[in-house]
Design a protein with these regions (language model features):
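A short, hydrophobic C-terminal helix/tail in secreted or cell-surface proteins
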Residues: 256-261
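N-terminal low-complexity, acidic/polar interaction/targeting segments
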Residues: 1-255
Length: 261
């Protein structure tokens, strides 16, 4: 690549190669594998590896957009380190990244051979003194909702269960739980966009309640399907029995009648 880009810090602004993510949100301290296939994304990976640079990972709003413009991407993402790159084919690479810190883009150049972002570190505002009582109640609600989700989804890994049940740090839980439990990427991004810890706790409670309700609905649907299948199988079995009985000839050749006199 002949394009020259200088990664620098200017007035707390970082200039980094960026990768637009489809249906994926990476949080700080999140270690994640994903595949990169678009030319601009591969070019960003190659440049970052060659120059030992971090990258800015940002989700695009429309997953179908092949070449999204700046306005088609969210404001907040994560500055990440590329830990590993594996070439899958000529036009596909698989990378392992580790999220470092949350950042907000101030500019995004989409015209070059790869996306180039100007970003500012965006730490989440901690809980204020007057918010502590609400935060404590919300955190308790998060733990209760997690237990409810766990009871309906036993496939949650033991590592996730241990991390959530053994930790009471709201800042950690507000990033760890969305990264590992929430299904919809829009829900993950909503947490990423929220800049206050109390706001993140409120969002997390709301999203976990919805996740629990969705699991309840899934269970109800599965039960109804099972009941319908059982009924259909019983009806089919009875129908086949009646059909066989109606078709079976009755022989009186060797029938012995009882003596009555």
């Amino acid at each position: 690549m002949s394009e020259k880009v200088t990664v620098k810090v200017e007035r707390n602004i970082l200039h980094l190669p960026a990768i637009a993510l489809r249906g994926l949100v990476v949080f700080p301290n999140n270690l994640l594998h994903f595949e990169v296939g678009r030319d601009k994304s591969i070019a960003a990976v190659e440049w970052a590896v060659r120059n030992k640079s971090e990258v800015f990972l940002i989700a695009q709003k429309d997953m179908k957009a092949e070449d999204p413009k700046a306005e088609e991407m969210y404001q907040y993402g994560v500055v990440a380190e590329i830990k590993q790159v594996m070439r899958v084919s000529d036009d596909l690479v698989r990378i392992l990244v580790e999220g470092k810190f949350r950042a907000k883009r101030t500019e995004l150049d989409t015209e070059g051979s790869f996306l180039l972002a100007s970003v500012r570190p965006a730490p989440v505002r901690p809980i204020k003194a007057e918010e502590e009582t609400e935060a404590e109640a919300l955190l308790r609600n998060v733990k209760t909702s997690f237990d409810a989700v766990l009871s309906m989804n036993p496939r949650i890994s033991k590592d996730v269960v241990f991390a959530v049940t053994s930790n009471n740090d709201p800042a950690f839980l507000c990033e760890y739980i969305p990264a590992n439990l929430l299904f919809r990427f829009e829900d993950k991004q909503a947490v990423m966009e929220e800049s206050t810890l109390i706001g993140r706790l409120r969002l997390l409670v709301e999203r976990l309640h919805r996740e629990r309700r969705m699991l309840e609905i899934d269970k109800e649907i599965a039960q109804k399907v099972d009941e319908a299948m059982d009924k259909n199988q019983r009806d089919y079995y009875l129908h086949e029995q009646m059909h066989m009985i109606s078709q079976e000839p009755v022989s009186y050749t060797h029938l012995t009648l009882p003596t009555i006199a």
